[in-house]
Structures are given as structure tokens and as C-alpha cells.
Design a protein with these regions (language model features):
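Cross-family detector of peptidyl-prolyl cis-trans isomerase
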Residues: 1-158
Length: 158
């Protein structure tokens, strides 16, 4: 499998999180979607997607956070990497600058459905089919009918 080597960055306030709870690491069933490093607070290392893209939303915790839980009305501060399922290419990443801040209600349906329940301090994989993302029109570097994979670190929840 091809692994992208990404530059590591420190995240202010990044404390060591407990890794004793179940669900902190991806199971072998989850790894069929995508290999993602669990180095919370640093830019994730992401393997190239393998196989046919899922047709349903995939929302899997890689690291379970211990902070405030995301709800539909939350404003999130996150670091994320977005890759194309088809090519494995990184399309966007917040890791080269400050974390992104936005209301969950203002983003694509895949995030609105896949982020609630996550806790600050965690890392989650979202694999989002086109109908919950940008559909047939695409957007910027995102092609039409493209399945997207996001790796999201929640820094804080307001």
C-alpha cells in the first residue's frame, strides 16, 4: 500500500489522551477502508484507499476524545485532511496553518451526519459518498461524483 509521508506539526494544548477505551484504534474491518495513523495532534499519515468506495457514510473513531461532545449545533475547531477516494490525492489540509473553525450546520451533509457524538481531543475518519458531499457538480479540486475521505482531529467544541 502506498503511504503518504506528511509533515508533522505540533498542536497547541495537545495533551496525551488515554488510549485504554475500546474503539481508540481502527479494527481490521475498518482498515479495509483506509489506514490512518493515530498520532493525535500531528498531521495524520494516510494510506491510499483500497477497493471500491463505500456507498454509505463511514464514521469511525481512530482516537476517542475525552472532551466536549459534538452535537448538531456545535461550532467546531478542527484540523483535517481531505483525500480523494479515487486517487488517494490530498485535496485539502488545514495542517499547514491554523485549525479551521465553523458551525457544523454550515458544512456538507456527510460532516453533519458523521461528526455528532465525537469528542474533542479525538480523531475520526469520515468516508463520504458523493450524495452527502458535493454531488454531480463537485467543488474546486473535488471532482463530480467523488467519494471523499476526511481525517478530522477535533481541537475544541463550542
Amino acid at each position: 500500500a502506498l503511504i503518504f509521508s506528511l509533515t508533522s506539526c505540533s498542536l497547541d494544548g495537545g495533551a496525551d489522551e488515554s488510549t485504554e477505551e475500546m474503539g481508540n484504534s481502527m479494527s481490521s474491518a475498518d482498515r479495509e477502508y483506509l489506514n490512518v495513523s493515530d498520532n493525535i495532534g500531528s498531521e495524520p499519515v494516510i494510506g491510499k484507499p483500497d477497493g471500491i468506495a463505500p456507498t454509505q457514510l463511514v464514521s469511525r473513531d481512530i482516537v476517542v476524545g475525552t472532551g466536549t461532545q459534538v452535537v448538531s449545533t456545535s461550532t467546531l475547531t478542527v484540523h483535517y485532511v481531505l483525500i480523494s477516494w479515487a486517487t488517494g490525492e490530498v485535496l485539502q489540509s488545514s495542517w499547514s496553518g491554523a485549525p479551521a473553525v465553523f458551525p457544523l450546520s454550515g458544512v456538507i451533509q456527510g460532516w453533519q451526519q458523521g461528526m455528532p457524538g465525537m469528542k474533542a481531543g479525538g480523531r475520526r475518519l469520515l468516508v463520504i459518498p458523493p450524495e452527502l458531499a458535493y454531488g454531480a457538480s463537485g467543488s474546486g479540486p473535488i471532482g463530480p461524483n467523488e467519494t471523499l475521505a476526511f481525517v478530522v482531529d477535533v481541537v475544541s467544541v463550542d
